[in-house]
C-alpha cells in the first residue's frame, strides 16, 4: 500500500510537471538567486506559440513579483558591430531586472518577438498569470504584489496595463514609454517629416543652431537644440514613416487604475512630447508621476540596449558615426528609474506618496 501511495504521488507530480507551460527549461544559480530560462507556451491569435522567457527568484523573497516588458519588437539584441549578444527576455536586466532581484523581488520577462499593442498586452498578461501559477507550483506562495516595468514599446504595454488591468498589476513603472498621446505623436511626426529634409546635415551641413529651421525642429520634437546630434535617427525615421499609410490606432485613455510612475529623458525625441501631453490629461492626477531626466535620450547611455540602436543607425540607416556615438555618450536615467521603482513600491505597499512630478539632473535625488 505504501509503495502504491508513493507511485501515485510521483505520477501526480509528473502530471503537474507535464501540464506546466514552461518547457525546455534550464534551471541555474545566478547572483542573488535562482533562474529558470527556456520557452513558455502562450496563446496568440487563437493558437499556441512558444516564446523565450526568464524567471528569477531571490534567495530571500519579499513576496512580490516584477514583470519586465522590453522595448522594440523583440528577438535578437546586437552589439554595435551587429553581433548577436542576446534576446529580449533579458533586455531589461541592466535596467531593472538585476536591481529588482537584489531587492528581494522575483523577476520575470518574456520575449514578445514581434507582438505589440493590445496583442502584446494580452501576451504579457497571459505570461504574468502563468508565472504566478508556476511560482506556486514550485513551492512558493502566490505573489502578494505584482508590478509591471516597461521600456519604450514595453512602456506602452505597461501603460495599457495601468489603464486596463487593476486586478493583475498593483503598480506600473514606465520608462521612455510609447502610447502617451496619439494626437501629439501624429503632430510631431508630421512636423518632423516636413522639417527634417530642410536641416538634414547630410544635405545641409553647418546650419547654425540659431537658424529658425533648427529651432522649429527642436520645438516639433520637444527637445532642446543641444540634442541635435541625436536628431538624425528620428528625423530620417519620420520621413520614411510619412511615405507609408497611417495605420489605425486608438489613443490612450489616460485614465489610470493603479499607481504609475514614468521616467523619461528630456532629449528623448521619440516620446517626450507625448508623455508631457499624457501627464497633462491623465486622471486621476494623484495616481501619476512624470520624472524627466535632463540630457538623456530614449536609451540611457549605460544601457547595453543602446548598442542595438547604434548598429541600426550606422549599418542599416547609414547615418553618420557621430549619431551612434552620441547615443552611447549621453548620461544615465537608470538611477532615477531605480529610485522611481522604490517610490512605486512604497506608494503601493505603504501608501506613501512619491515626490511630485519634476525634472532632475542625472544622478540627482528626487525631492
What residues fall within each predicted segment?
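Gly/Ser-rich "nucleophile elbow"/oxyanion-hole loop immediately N-terminal to the catalytic nucleophile
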Residues: 58-63, 127-152, 168
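Alpha/beta-hydrolase active-site loop
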Residues: 116-137, 336-342
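Conserved alpha/beta-hydrolase
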Residues: 95-114, 344
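C-terminal subdomain of alpha/beta-hydrolase-fold enzymes, centered on the catalytic histidine
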Residues: 228-367
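Short, solvent-exposed loop/turn and secondary-structure capping segments
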Residues: 76-86, 118-121, 137, 159-162, ...
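Primarily recognizes the serine-hydrolase "nucleophile elbow" in alpha/beta-hydrolase
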Residues: 144-196
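Accessory cap/linker subdomain of secreted extracellular hydrolases
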Residues: 20-55, 173-255, 331-334, 355-359, ...
